[in-house]
């Protein structure tokens, strides 16, 4: 059987991806964190918790591993519930932490790619009807504007939604 030779263009991004809910730990009040606490939420009744402890600083270890394996990009998400825990409250220290992560990637020669929404919603947003609320686009646009404004100096690549069809179905 002949071997296939694949060529990738110069500048092709090799990397990996994460989701805030899956790696950060210390989960804020989101629809997923609430669901995970329900007895019927997970088959074996395990509960969400520390995850990979990125929020406590272990992201540095993973970024070092990405650098050691010559990755050139890393997609991470910003946890909306962490940045905007209540409709009229913004957590600036949380944005500072995400900024620190993006700086860490850039210092390692890794291009950050930020996903603004990776499946989870703030609990206040879910309690107001989530994406079925006619104000949902307004809420999300304000969140996105604030995050992009805070992080744009450290990130050139953005994804609005991870798997948007999950909500459409």
Where are these regions (language model features)?
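Substrate-binding cleft and catalytic face of glycoside hydrolase catalytic domains
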Residues: 24-25, 61-169
């Amino acid at each position: 059987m002949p071997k296939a030779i694949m060529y990738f263009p110069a500048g092709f991004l090799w990397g990996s991806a994460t989701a805030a809910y899956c790696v950060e730990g210390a989960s804020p009040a989101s629809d997923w964190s609430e669901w995970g606490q329900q007895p019927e939420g997970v088959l074996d009744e395990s509960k969400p918790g520390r995850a990979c402890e990125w929020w406590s600083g272990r992201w540095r270890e993973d970024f070092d591993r990405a650098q050691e394996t010559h990755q050139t990009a890393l997609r991470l998400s910003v946890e909306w519930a962490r940045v905007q825990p209540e409709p009229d409250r913004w957590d600036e220290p949380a944005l500072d932490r995400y900024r620190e992560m993006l700086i860490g990637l850039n210092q390692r020669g890794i291009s950050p790619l930020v996903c603004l929404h990776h499946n989870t919603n703030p609990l206040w947003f879910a309690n107001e009807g989530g994406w079925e609320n006619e104000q949902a686009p307004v809420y999300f646009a304000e969140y996105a504007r604030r995050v992009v404004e805070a992080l744009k100096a450290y990130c050139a690549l953005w994804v609005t939604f991870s798997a948007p069809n999950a909500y459409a179905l």
